[in-house]
Amino acid sequence: MFSPQSRLRHAVADTFAMVVYCSVVNMCIEVFLSGMSFEQSFYSRLVAIPVNILIAWPYGMYRDLFMRAARKVSPSGWIKNLADILAYVTFQSPVYVAILLVVGADWHQIMAAVSSNIVVSMLMGAVYGYFLDYCRRLFKVSRYQQVKA
């Protein structure tokens, strides 16, 4: 349908990756670590889907900047993982705060959710980065230059 060089194909791959990853991971964090009710978390994820659709491709380009910088520093895998973590945390945390405010989470819940998300992102390594790489391959995004770990 779209050529492998299509920017739309790239945007669709990035959007798919972000919606799926953020829905699963953040719901687990909100319910099991932050003390939000299932209903609050469900509504948070519903609000997050259109937000994730809007920010997915800009985030993908933002992450690609971190990957290019990491490649210049070192070809090692731990630099790529660190760049993935920094890109994710610095881009997603402010967006996550806004989503939680919209759904009525209080400041204690917001701080718990965002800080837990940061810690989980660090503990999980660069899982989202690997998932994004996988989705880009799945959608056959040809212009994408993967940094090998």
UniProtKB/Swiss-Prot annotation:
GO MF assignments: L-amino acid efflux transmembrane transporter activity
GO cellular component terms, A-Z: plasma membrane
Keyword Transmembrane appears in the UniProt entry: yes
Domain of life, source organism: Bacteria
Protein's membrane topology: Multi-pass membrane protein
The organism of origin for this protein: Escherichia coli (strain K12)
Family affiliation: Belongs to the AlaE exporter family.
Job description of the protein: Exports L-alanine.
Induction: Induced in the presence of L-alanyl-L-alanine dipeptides.
Pfam family, one: AlaE
Disruption phenotype annotation: Mutants show a significant accumulation of intracellular L-alanine and a reduction in the L-alanine export rate.
Subcellular location, record wording: Cell inner membrane
Gene Ontology biological process terms in this record: amino acid export across plasma membrane; cellular response to stress; L-alanine transport
Keywords: Amino-acid transport, Cell inner membrane, Cell membrane, Membrane, Transmembrane, Transmembrane helix, Transport
Main subcellular localisation: membrane
Entry's transmembrane regions: 16-36, 46-66, 85-105, 112-132
Protein name: L-alanine exporter AlaE
